[in-house]
Amino acid sequence: MKSKTGVLLGRLMRNIMRSPDTIITVAITPIMMMLLFVYVFGGAIKTGTENYVNYLLPGILLMAIASGVAYTSVRLFMDVKSGLMARFITMPIKRSSILWAHVLTSLVANVLTIVVVILVALLMGFRSSANILDWLAVAGILGMFTLALTWLAIIPGLKARSMEGATAYSYPLVFLPFISSAFVPTETMPKIVRAFAENQPVTSIVNAIRALLYEGTVGNDIWIALAWCVGIMIISYFFASKAFKRQLG
């Protein structure tokens, strides 16, 4: 399975490298949001920190991932509609390799996007006191979040009837950081909005990453964040597998 998955992964990565504008496009939106919030709104937002880009970066990284996984749906949808998926199914390869290749491609592509966003944040003044273990923990959380959303993206990629349908699911995911602690403290929100913000996955993930990067108190946020990621991944994997079995006929 590993060798077959590697071959399929190589095919998808070559497609991405032939059109690097995909990664650039995915990175541009969160970078533009970061520029807008830091240089236009940053002075008016009270977060209790002097460096707003430090406060903002964790949420921007999650937004970049949410934007990036949408391309998983697109790539899978194109494989299905072009008949390439049907050809793969007839080949002597383990069928799960087909989906895992798309999942790993999403993981690699999002790593590249995250690196680009962090480099831009460094130019804007981002600084962290995190040690190597903290950074590894941050990488682990971001990786789990990417895998969770990628398996979620597999479902519309297999079931959508149009390109628009394959990408539309990502819109709520990109919007979630706006109703979380990503941009402003939840304490400043109206009660109903605050109740939602404090009990959705992005807030706990953002808080955990922020604490790891800036020597804060991680507390239960990291376990809640991991529970959200694992829960979304398991549920998405289950429904993606069912959708794939229907695709196999």
Predicted regions located by residue number:
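Alpha-helical transmembrane segments and their short interhelical loops
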Residues: 95-168, 217-241
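Short, membrane-interfacial amphipathic segments enriched in basic
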Residues: 1-9, 149, 192-203
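Residue-level recognition of transmembrane alpha-helices
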Residues: 26-27, 56, 60, 79, ...
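Membrane-interfacial helix-loop-helix junctions in multi-pass membrane proteins
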Residues: 15, 46-47, 180-234
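Short cytosolic juxtamembrane segments of multi-pass membrane proteins
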Residues: 242-249
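Transmembrane helix segments
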Residues: 36-44, 157-199
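Aromatic- and glycine-rich beta-strand/loop motifs that create alpha-glucan
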Residues: 1-29
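Hydrophobic alpha-helical transmembrane segments of multi-pass membrane transport proteins
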Residues: 32-37, 53-124, 156, 169-172, ...
